[in-house]
Curated annotation (Swiss-Prot):
NCBIfam families, sorted: fabH (TIGR00747), PRK09352.1 (NF006829)
Key words, A-Z: Acyltransferase, Cytoplasm, Fatty acid biosynthesis, Fatty acid metabolism, Lipid biosynthesis, Lipid metabolism, Multifunctional enzyme, Transferase
Compartment(s) of residence: Cytoplasm
Name listed for the protein in its UniProt record: Beta-ketoacyl-[acyl-carrier-protein] synthase III
This protein's record includes keyword Lipid biosynthesis: yes
Listed pathway(s): Lipid metabolism; fatty acid biosynthesis
One Gene Ontology term from the biological process aspect of the record: fatty acid biosynthetic process
Similarity-based family: Belongs to the thiolase-like superfamily. FabH family.
Domain notes from UniProt: The last Arg residue of the ACP-binding site is essential for the weak association between ACP/AcpP and FabH.
One matching Pfam family: ACP_syn_III_C
Enzyme class, broadest EC rank: transferase
InterPro entries: ACP_syn_III_C, ACP_syn_III_N, FabH, Thiolase-like
């Protein structure tokens, strides 16, 4: 008897945004107190962002991840103790170590000894984490995975740099994957080029009890834009090829929610109508690894994404890293 193909399938999604919603005007007013000039019009014209959410000082990345995880587990209708793999994509972990995934496992009360670890690929992190979990499930090493993108990016923003501090926000998104004979994740592609590490980075590190280097995010916006629009189309086409799908078979595109101009450019290059692109950057800002699963959950819960539809996700981030996955929801 021929052995059936094993897939990893999305059973449920969840997300969380901290309650402090900050509009462009509110942020501009805060910055003006330090002599930093910006405006709602300037931010919207360049990015499409109108608001973002910031976590309170005592709220950690694992706190954000916990709520998103609980909502995804509830939507998936699974026993938390059946989750034998937790992967958290984050660039803003609670600690140097242990991993945010281990902290989350404990907060969820999961005591089964399953694997838990973090993935750090910045804004591509969720694409990396999803593909990693898919590989573990397809090979039979794990059966049920909790995959999360979570960030408290406000912790590493320099609020004296108007070119970066207006872009980012905090939040978390999660999915529960489970082994299935029914097609789920159909193809993924991951890439990196470390020679571009300096164009988007937070170059500080802990050295003998002090921060060595800068603890704030640094970005060459023009270089990032140029590289992003070049690689996103290519990695999306590669993932579709592995899935044996044409772009016209994609029901929904969920790009990393960084900049509306990058997003619309990629959508256009793929030949997809703009109406098929999920957009949350206007309300969420750039939440790094959380942006894709946040947008996914929003579109699932508002009824746009339906069972049986093909969803293409793609991200690009510091490293430089980029990745894409296509799945049947």
């Amino acid at each position: 008897m021929a052995q059936s193909t094993l897939y990893s399938r999305v059973l449920g999604t969840g997300s969380y945004l901290p309650p402090d919603r900050v509009t462009n005007q509110e942020l501009a007013d805060r910055l003006a107190k330090d002599g930093i000039e910006t405006s709602d019009e300037w931010i919207v014209a360049r990015t499409g962002i109108r608001a973002r959410h910031f976590a309170a000082p005592d709220v950690t990345t694992s706190d954000l991840a916990l709520v998103a995880a609980q909502r995804a587990i509830e939507a998936a209708d699974v026993d938390p103790q059946s989750i034998d793999l937790i992967i958290v994509a984050t660039s803003t972990p609670d600690f140097v170590f242990p991993s945010t995934a281990c902290l989350l496992q404990n907060k969820l009360g999961i005591k089964n000894g399953g694997a838990a670890f973090d993935v750090q690929a910045v804004c591509s992190g969720f694409a990396y984490a999803l593909a990693t979990a898919d590989s573990f499930i397809r090979t039979g090493q794990h059966r049920t995975a909790l995959v999360i993108g979570a960030e408290a990016f406000s912790r590493i923003l320099d609020f004296k740099d108007r070119t970066t501090c207006v872009l980012f926000g905090d939040g978390a998104g999660a999915v529960v994957l489970s082994a299935s004979e029914e097609p789920g994740i159909l193809g993924s592609a991951l890439h990196a080029d470390g020679s571009y590490s300096n164009i988007l980075c937070t170059p500080g590190n802990v050295n003998r009890g002090v921060i060595a280097g800068s603890a704030f995010l640094h970005m060459d916006g023009q270089a990032v834009f140029k590289l992003a629009v070049n690689v996103l189309e290519k990695v999306a086409v590669e993932a579709l090829s592995k899935a044996e799908l044409a772009s016209e078979q994609v029901d929904w595109l969920i790009p990393h929610q960084a900049n509306i101009r990058i997003m619309t450019s990629t959508c256009r290059k793929l030949g997809l109508p703009q109406e098929r692109m999920i957009v949350t950057v206007d309300e969420h800002g750039n939440t790094s690894a959380a942006s894709i699963p946040l947008a996914l959950d929003v579109a699932v819960r508002d009824g746009r994404i339906k069972r049986g539809q093909h969803v293409l996700i793609e991200g690009v981030g510091g490293g430089f890293t980029w990745g894409a996955s296509v799945f049947r929801f």
